[in-house]
Regions:
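Outer-membrane beta-barrel "beta-signal"
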Residues: 165-179
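Transmembrane beta-barrel architecture of outer-membrane proteins
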Residues: 20-24, 90-92, 126-130, 167-171
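A generic structural signal for short coil/turn motifs at secondary-structure boundaries
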Residues: 119-122, 155-157
Length: 179
């Protein structure tokens, strides 16, 4: 995707426009094993993103522990947000294994994923790791997931991002597909 003058930033009293450029390549595998009863799934993607000079955006579920005071600057020390979009490159990989379903059609699927990003705005690589299990019921119409996450934290100090301690997260979710 390319779009001229899609983004802007201020330099002094001037408004400077820059293009948006997004490129990616991805591979996907979904292969049945053991006479189709087990399934291995893999995905890998590399993404080059140009949102303009030093663009960086945090993403995370809204959290009352995060301040609404803009003077506090960017921080990932509270809440669960981390840098997810920015000018730079990202490599994302995911591997999952689904075990054979039981007689009621329920099955477990374990998975792990890793995201490593090299953003222009941060001196250090951003590495996020997830691992978890899905419990699939009713031919994947109902799903309970338990996800463990390990992510970096950063503090903004004098215009520079400083690495903080890594933080853990645990998410339990339920999804139901209506037909």
């Amino acid at each position: 995707i390319f779009q001229r003058n899609a983004l802007w930033h201020s330099e002094g009293s001037d408004t400077v426009y820059s293009p948006l450029a997004l490129m990616s390549a991805a591979l996907f595998l979904d292969a049945p094993l053991h006479e189709g009863k087990h399934v291995v799934t893999a995905y890998a993607g590399i993404f080059h993103m140009n949102y303009g000079a030093n663009y960086l955006r945090y993403n995370g579920i809204m959290n009352p522990g995060t301040s609404m005071d803009p003077s506090k600057g960017v921080s990932s020390m509270t809440g669960n947000a981390y840098p997810m979009f920015g000018t730079g490159q990202t490599l994302y990989t995911q591997l999952a294994y689904a075990f054979a379903p039981d007689v009621q059609g329920r099955r477990f699927q374990g998975y792990a994923s890793a995201t490593v990003s090299d953003y222009q705005a941060i001196e250090y690589p951003v590495a996020i790791v997830h691992a978890g299990v899905n419990w699939l019921e009713s031919a994947h119409r109902s799903k309970i997931s338990l996800d463990f996450e390990n992510r970096p934290t950063y503090e903004l100090s004098n215009g520079n991002f400083l690495q903080g301690p890594r933080k853990w997260g645990l998410v339990l979710q339920y999804q139901y597909y209506l037909q």
